[in-house]
Amino acid sequence: MVKLEIKNVTKSFYRNEGKQSTLINAIENVNLAVNDGEFVCLVGPSGCGKSTLLNILAGLDNPTKGQVVLNGRPVTGTGPDKIMVFQENALFPWMKVIDNVEFGLKIAKVEKIKRREIAMQYLDMMQLKKFAEAYVYQLSGGMKQRVSIARALVLDPEVLLMDEPFAALDSQTRDLLLVELQLIWAKTNKTIIFVTHNIIESVCLGDRVVVFTNRPGKIKKNIKIDYRRPRLTEDDNLKDFQRQVLYELKSEMVHSRKEKIDLF
């Protein structure tokens, strides 16, 4: 069953160049259907509009043309049905871990005992239960991202949106979190859309890897990753999938450079 539909979405903005303004399309005519419980990774050249699209999906920005439909209803703004996890955590460092995870539930006026129960359930899932009373500033970068994911999941969103959440982490911590995220996804059956510039990461996580063109960002290729889980980054059986994604990205770079050369 389709959970999320992106229908002919274009996002434009004006860029000032001296006394003139130039209309720029960040993304153009993007169409994508994401099934319930599917894990979709978005990759593409820097500046191709992946994060712009994610902001539109979250309701943080509006498309210039087209629409996003979640569970049959147009997305018109933010809400607990679609939660974003960013590269830089948005945790409150002066609060304890448990208070950060409970924060959204408190805003939603969930009864205190119930919200503590839910928060502890997800901290346990993220292997952070024993750090519930620690302060955020006492945690490592990887642990902070786990808290961010737990805080997003406690609200039971329809779609979890992740914008390069592991980009700032060291490779060892990232690889560990890649496995943990797959296990959590299997337990919760959440629909996840994950933006990354890392090919290995995308193939390790995604049911599909959606490759974007250079700006204006359009969908160039959908690559299905039909392989068992949990996946490890070191698994040689994933290398063919990685090569497919790399080929599409490199061919896009070559095509883009040729177009620029042909202009002269």
Predicted regions and their residues:
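A short, proline-enriched helix->beta-strand linker immediately N-terminal to the Walker B motif
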Residues: 154-158
